[in-house]
Each structure stands twice: as structure tokens, then as C-alpha cells.
């Protein structure tokens, strides 16, 4: 299990726990995060979720070591296990970033929140950052776009001029 859920009264804490990979996302983590946030949204006793990455990193984006194992496969996207378009629970590469929840989620960001990790932070309703925290979109250097809503969410949050 790479995701832990802790409850303290109306507060649900969702912890992404892959510190050895700087909490980089892989398909198992993505599925577990979707399940955790879907359960949080359905829980009548839960009012707010706090989301953070264990070990001093919020999320370093997609797990490139995992991605390298897909090389040479005829259908590499099939290994990512994305639900079909008619799925009642939408899931993107970063997991919950396409969910629409009825309760607020707070990102508690420490260390890097880069590429897809930045997109996860943008998905949250509020972002609280430690002094060690930073956002980045380094994947653009190699022509890899943000694919989980970041290019839409960032301008909505900070304005187009600042987002550029």
C-alpha cells in the first residue's frame, strides 16, 4: 500500500507514501489515491481532507523508472490501467486529478511538487507550503506536456500572465 488514510474527527488525512521515489506516481499509487479520495467524499462524517507526501516530498511527478519499464511494449498505455471513457470514476495519470469532489482538499506541500505533482497540488482547493516547498514544470524542457489539468488550472488560479 502506497497510500495511507488517517481520520481524526471530521479531518481525513491522505498520505502518499513512496518516499524512496520522492512520492513519484505509478499506476498503483494513482488507483489508491482515487479510492482514498472517493471514500473521503462519500464519508458523511468527513468534512475536509489534508493531502501530503511522506518523507519531505509532496510528489515528484510521474515515476520515470516505472515509465522506462514500458519501453518496447506494443500497448504501453494498457499497462497504465486507465478506466474507459464511460467509467463513473474518472482517473488520470496522476490519479485523483480528474475527480470532482464535494468537500475541500488541502495540499500540505513540503519539498518538490513538480510536473504531475504540481498538477495534484493545483487540483486541491487550497495549498499550504512549507519553506522547503517548491513548484516546477521541468518536463516541458523535453517537450512533455502537463496532461492532468495543470495547464487549465494554473491560469484559473493565478491569471494567464503569471501562468505564462
Describe the role of every protein-language-model region:
Residues 96-164:
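Crotonase-fold acyl-CoA enzyme core
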Residues 58, 64-67, 144, 154:
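Short clusters of hydrophobic/aromatic residues that line enzyme substrate/ligand-binding pockets
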Residues 30-32, 38, 64-110:
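An acidic, glycine-rich surface segment that forms the CoA-thioester-binding/catalytic face
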Residues 27-28, 62, 119, 149:
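Generic recognition of short, well-ordered alpha-helical segments
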Residues 1-56, 68-72:
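Conserved CoA-thioester-binding segment of acyl-CoA-metabolizing enzymes
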Residues 14, 51, 63, 120-121:
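Hydrophobic/aromatic residues within transmembrane alpha-helices
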Residues 56-60, 65, 114, 136:
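Short, active-site-adjacent cap segments at secondary-structure transitions
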Residues 25-26, 62, 71, 139, ...:
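Short, flexible helix/strand-to-coil boundary loops that buttress conserved ligand/catalytic motifs
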Amino acid at each position: 500500500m502506497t497510500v495511507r488514510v488517517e481520520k481524526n474527527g471530521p479531518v481525513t488525512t491522505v498520505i502518499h507514501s513512496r518516499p524512496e521515489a520522492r512520492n513519484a506516481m505509478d499506476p498503483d499509487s494513482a488507483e489508491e489515491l482515487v479510492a482514498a479520495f472517493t471514500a473521503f467524499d462519500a464519508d458523511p462524517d468527513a468534512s475536509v481532507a489534508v493531502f501530503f507526501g511522506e518523507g519531505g516530498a509532496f510528489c515528484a511527478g510521474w515515476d520515470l523508472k516505472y515509465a522506462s519499464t514500458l519501453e518496447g511494449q506494443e500497448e504501453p498505455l494498457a499497462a497504465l490501467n486507465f478506466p474507459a471513457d464511460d467509467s463513473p470514476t474518472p482517473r488520470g495519470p496522476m490519479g485523483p486529478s480528474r475527480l470532482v469532489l464535494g468537500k475541500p482538499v488541502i495540499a500540505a506541500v513540503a519539498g518538490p511538487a513538480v510536473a504531475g505533482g504540481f498538477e495534484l497540488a493545483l487540483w486541491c482547493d487550497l495549498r499550504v507550503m512549507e519553506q522547503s516547498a517548491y513548484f516546477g514544470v521541468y518536463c516541458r524542457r523535453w517537450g512533455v506536456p502537463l496532461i492532468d489539468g495543470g495547464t487549465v488550472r494554473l491560469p484559473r488560479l493565478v491569471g494567464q500572465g503569471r501562468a505564462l
